Structures are given as C-alpha cells and as structure tokens.
Amino acid sequence: LDHRLFIDQIPYVGTSLTHSYNNAYTDSAAAATAWSTGYKTKNRYLSLDPDKKILDTIVEMLHKKGYTSGLVATSSVTHATPAALYAHIDSRYEYKNIANQLMNSSIDIALGGGKEFFDLNKINDTHYVLTEKESLQLNFDHSKKLIGLFDDDGIERSNEKPTQRQMTNFVLNHFNKQCSGFFLMTEGSQIDWAGHDNDANEMIEEFKDFDLTIRDLINFVNEDNETLL
C-alpha cells in the first residue's frame, strides 16, 4: 500500500463491548445478531434471543417502512454475518436451512458465494440467479429479487470471480437507479479467514479490496448527501 487507508479517513470512530450473552468472547453469529437486532444472544444463534424467541432484524424493520435491502459477502451468503440479517435459527451451521430462509426473506439482492447450499432450479422462478462475474455488467429490473452465487462456498480470489468492490458497486448502482431508500451490508469476509490461517499476504490482498470498497462507499455518500455509511 502506498497511501493512507481510506477506512482511516472516516472521521468518527467508536468502540463496543463484544462479549456475547453467554461467553466472554463472541462468535460471528452472536456479534452479527447484536448489530442486526440490537440484542445480545448466545454464540451460534442467529437473530434469536437466548430463549430462542425471534428478534426482528434491521432488514425486516426497514422492509416494513418500504426500504430495499441487499447484502454482499466474499463468504457464502449463508455465513453467519450476512445470515444474521435474515435468518432465525439456533445454529449458524445449518447452511441449507439458512439458504431456504434467505429465499423467503426481505433481502432483495444477495451477492456472494454458497452455491452448494441452494437448489438453483427451484429459485429461478422468484430470483434472477447470477453465477458468472460478467453478469454484473447487466441491468435487471425489480420484477424479481436477485441472488448472485459466484462460488460453491467462499469466493476464490481470482480474475474469474467478482471482488467485494465489484459486487458492492453493482448493488449501489442497481439500488440508486431503482429505489428511493435502501440498506446495504457489505462484508470483506476473508480478511478474517486469512487471519485464522496466519496468511499475511492473503490478508493484505483481501484488505486492499475491502479498503477500495470503503473508498467507493465514501464517494457515493459524499455525492448523494442522503445516505449514511
């Protein structure tokens, strides 16, 4: 990197206590549930309270107010962080169940990996299904919801696969043209995975993509003046 990180140029920084309801350290499911619903829960739970009662997510609340919602992840779209926006289940690892919940959720666009957890033949009636990077160059109307599944699980970083930045910009452009208000969550999922693997080079490459995504989001917000990042 030969420049200051774009994420470091965001003027406000906050801190949070990330312990989950039942543990001194959280996992992704409990953490994502906390910011998606406003409530702490047990590790492994997705948008359920500790007694397994359903918690409304920010996507579900905004849907009632007429907002469009989307998510982007370089992991599977059924992974814990994106799943906390739409799934209600007591195990983050029930990927096929979570995939079914996504298909029946308020999410209008979901882009990421996770193709192995979906029956593509069954979802064609309700969703535009994208599986190739080139499809992000196309325009789609709002007659169907849209799901992009660009790898079997997490998206391999290669020239044949879309980056977080490319997927995020696709959603921004689509929403900006065709809806009056929207919510978007975008996750650089594999920064974390590279950390688990002690792979510094991969972590840097993944973070570069994440940081360029942040740059584009900052530019969008500054030009739009009606969007909160």
Locations of regions flagged by a protein language model:
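Phosphate/oxyanion-binding active-site loops and adjacent basic polyanion-contact surfaces
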Residues: S91, E160-T168, E206-F210
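Hydrophobic anchor at the start of a short beta-strand
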Residues: S69, F182, T227-L229
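Active-site His/acidic residue clusters
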Residues: A80-L85, D152-I155, K177-G181, M185-D216
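Surface-exposed acidic, glycine-flexible loop patches that form ligand/cofactor-binding
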Residues: I58-M61, Q101, L138, L172-Q178, ...
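The substrate-binding groove and active-site-proximal loops of carbohydrate-active enzymes
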Residues: L46, I155-N159
